[in-house]
Amino acid sequence: ILTSIDIDPEHQRAAREAYAAAGIPSQRTRVISGDAGQVLGRLTDGAYDLVLVDADKEGYPVYVEQAIRLLRTGGVLVLDNMLWHDKVADPASRDGLTTLLRDLGKALREDDRLLPLLLPVGDGLLVAKKVWVPESGE
């Protein structure tokens, strides 16, 4: 099931229209109205093959932790705007959002649960595969 979360009714309408135009049956889609920070916590662990995060950048750290929980092993996390107008790669850029995204990218590179790749397309896509991590003692 293709699940979309958005707080804006216009975005929800546009999503439904795009799904219909793509020929995706409505019973294969779910549009959830609400704040992603609250909705994500109610979704099922390990039930998703792909999670795309394209939301308020301040919320990215929370959304990413929830997304990792939602992904099955082998699932893919995609984050939009990870180059943030080419400022993330510029050490002289130190505004709050740039620093947040730079730190998040570094944290994801160091996260043993993920195999990340930053693609320099558009405003930067970070694509990360969730890998199997044995629990301690295994």
Predicted feature residues:
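S-adenosylmethionine/decaboxylated-SAM
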Residues: I1-E138
